Each structure stands twice: as C-alpha cells, then as structure tokens.
Amino acid sequence: MFKEEIVVEHLVNVNRVTKVVKGGRRFSFSACVVLGNKAGKVGYGHGKAKEVGEARLKALQNAKKYMIEVPLYKGRTIHYDVYGKSGAAKVMLRRARAGTGIIAGGAMRFIFDSLGIQDVVAKSFGSSNSYLMIAATLNALKQLETPRVIAERRGLRLNELSVTIYKTFHEG
C-alpha cells in the first residue's frame, strides 16, 4: 500500500521473550518498528517470531498496515500543541520555531524523524515504556487538523477563526 513511499525505518527495540513450558523454556523475539516517508506519513508495528529477522519483518508488515497521515505546518512542525495518552504513558507535543530541532526523548524521536518533523518540543509523563510512548505520541498526532478543516467544521472562513488562532497559524 505505502511500499514505494517508505523512506525511513527505525527499529525501536528487540526483546527476547521466554515462554516456560513443561519441557523447559522456549525463546522467541519481539521487535518494534517505526516507519515513515519524511513527508507526513508514519506507522508503527510490532512482531514476534523465533528469529530476530522474522520478528522485524512481521513488525514492518504490521507498521505498513497501520500508517497514518499527519498534517504538518510548513512541512517542518505541528500546527498546534496537543496531548496524547496510551495506558499510563502521556505525552505533550508543542510546536516550535524554525531551528529549534527535535527536543524529545525516547521513542518519540523516531516518530518525529520518520514523519519529517524538524522542529518540535515533546515531553512524556508517566510510563516510559517504548510501546506505550509510541502509541501515545501517535494518538496525539491523530488529533491534529489543519486550520482549514477546523474552519470548515465550524462553518467559518479561515480568516474568521479567532484572532489568536489565526496568528498562530500564520506567524510561524
């Protein structure tokens, strides 16, 4: 589906998982992957298999299946501040001026890099589990809409949005 558009692939983590059975222990591997095209599309997935390579491939297939599109402001940051949550992980994403860079910790950095976001400030609260952090970040990014979509939903023209919102969207 998005195969030709994928530019960046980040392997977030690989874990060895042990299942205890009657005859002893069975080992397998789980992998978490973030994919993106550096132009507003990103997805993540995880896979589990007996070999690391197979787990990575399953994670890639899973990530391709669940890619989302995120509107970017001037192709470099998000339109407005947003919050996301998944389980005990909470994230706050804030837009940033040009030249700020990606100020984010943990797995969030992989998502922003894959999306093509160059300037953003992100803070995580609660759990630092990478799976939850990625899910919380994507939940926050799913909430983003362009000012045009917001204005249409409210039945307004773009310049009729509140003055502060209009300035936010037009003064970098």
From Swiss-Prot:
Keywords on record: Ribonucleoprotein, Ribosomal protein, RNA-binding, rRNA-binding
Biological process, per Gene Ontology: translation
One Pfam family cited in the UniProt record for this chain: Ribosomal_S5_C
SUPFAM superfamilies listed in its UniProt record: dsRNA-binding domain-like, Ribosomal protein S5 domain 2-like
InterPro entries: Ribosomal_Su5_D2-typ_SF, Ribosomal_uS5, Ribosomal_uS5_bac-type, Ribosomal_uS5_C, Ribosomal_uS5_N, Ribosomal_uS5_N_CS, Ribsml_uS5_D2-typ_fold_subgr
Coiled coil: none
Protein purpose: With S4 and S12 plays an important role in translational accuracy. Located at the back of the 30S subunit body where it stabilizes the conformation of the head with respect to the body.
Protein family per UniProt: Belongs to the universal ribosomal protein uS5 family.
Protein name: Small ribosomal subunit protein uS5
Organism annotation: Orientia tsutsugamushi (strain Boryong)
